[in-house]
Amino acid sequence: MAKVQYMGTGRRKEAVARVRLVPGEGKVVINKRSAEDYFGLETLRFIVNQPLNLTGTKGKFDVLVNVHGGGFTGQAGAIRHGISRALLKADETLKGELKKAGFLTRDPRMKERKKYGLKKARRAPQFSKR
């Protein structure tokens, strides 16, 4: 077990990510798989790496993530949120740029509930005049 590690919890939609930052060479491990294996899309890997690229800490920390719930986009957002919070614990001076980029803010947008009488949250059944 590493002597120095920084923890952060990130959330987005239904996804929850528990992130550990350990001084290392920049490996990202998500649910015991590499980020390249876990996220097929390049955009999702980009979202995960945004806080590290912004703060210039890309090669300084190994990122160990446990994430569950939600879909791939929600999980990527949760991981970004968790990494940002862990970086803040590692170095308080990064708060300004992380906050300005919006990485410390929990995205409040959630799925809207389905209403009775409708097919989905807002989609009404087809209407026929005659």
UniProtKB/Swiss-Prot annotation:
<dbReference type="InterPro" id="IPR020574">
    <property type="entry name" value="Ribosomal_uS9_CS"/>
</dbReference>
<dbReference type="InterPro" id="IPR014721">
    <property type="entry name" value="Ribsml_uS5_D2-typ_fold_subgr"/>
</dbReference>
<dbReference type="InterPro" id="IPR023035">
    <property type="entry name" value="Ribosomal_uS9_bac/plastid"/>
</dbReference>
<keyword id="KW-0689">Ribosomal protein</keyword>
<dbReference type="Pfam" id="PF00380">
    <property type="entry name" value="Ribosomal_S9"/>
</dbReference>
<comment type="similarity">
    <text>Belongs to the universal ribosomal protein uS9 family.</text>
</comment>
<dbReference type="InterPro" id="IPR000754">
    <property type="entry name" value="Ribosomal_uS9"/>
</dbReference>
<dbReference type="GO" id="GO:0003735">
    <property type="term" value="F:structural constituent of ribosome"/>
</dbReference>
<dbReference type="GO" id="GO:0022627">
    <property type="term" value="C:cytosolic small ribosomal subunit"/>
</dbReference>
<feature type="region of interest" description="Disordered">
    <location>
        <begin position="106"/>
        <end position="130"/>
    </location>
</feature>
<dbReference type="GO" id="GO:0006412">
    <property type="term" value="P:translation"/>
</dbReference>
<dbReference type="InterPro" id="IPR020568">
    <property type="entry name" value="Ribosomal_Su5_D2-typ_SF"/>
</dbReference>
<feature type="compositionally biased region" description="Basic residues">
    <location>
        <begin position="111"/>
        <end position="130"/>
    </location>
</feature>
<keyword id="KW-0687">Ribonucleoprotein</keyword>
<protein>
    <recommendedName>
        <fullName>Small ribosomal subunit protein uS9</fullName>
    </recommendedName>
</protein>
<dbReference type="GO" id="GO:0003723">
    <property type="term" value="F:RNA binding"/>
</dbReference>
